[in-house]
Amino acid sequence: MKTIFAVTLLLFAIYVPECMPCHQSGCSPGFCCWLTYPPTTATDPYSCVSNSTLGVSCGPCGCLQGYNCTSNGGCQLLRRVG
């Protein structure tokens, strides 16, 4: 059962790469999901990092700056108009 769950998480991470799956569980205010290298776990290469971390700029709802939330709890790149 654990194997099926892990594979499902891995596939989910591949198909929604921006802020998932750590964004799904949420980060505290002032923190956002950030791709860590090397990955902390095989199924979740993202971790919650502070907005004050060098090079990290968190936007609303735990997404990185320049991204907005999607209905499935992930993040997507903002489309610039003009």
Curated annotation (Swiss-Prot):
Keyword annotations from UniProtKB, A to Z: Disulfide bond, Ion channel impairing toxin, Secreted, Signal, Toxin
Top-level taxon in the UniProt lineage: Eukaryota
GO CC, one annotated term: extracellular region
Keyword Oxidoreductase attached: no
Molecular functions per Gene Ontology: ion channel regulator activity; toxin activity
Keyword Secreted: yes
Disulphide bonds in the chain: 22-33, 27-48, 32-61, 58-69, 63-75
Tissue expression from the record: Expressed by the venom gland.
Protein location: Secreted
Record's signal peptide: 1-21
Reported function: Probable ion channel inhibitor.
Name assigned to this protein: U17-hexatoxin-Hi1a
Organism whose genome encodes this protein: Hadronyche infensa (Fraser island funnel-web spider)
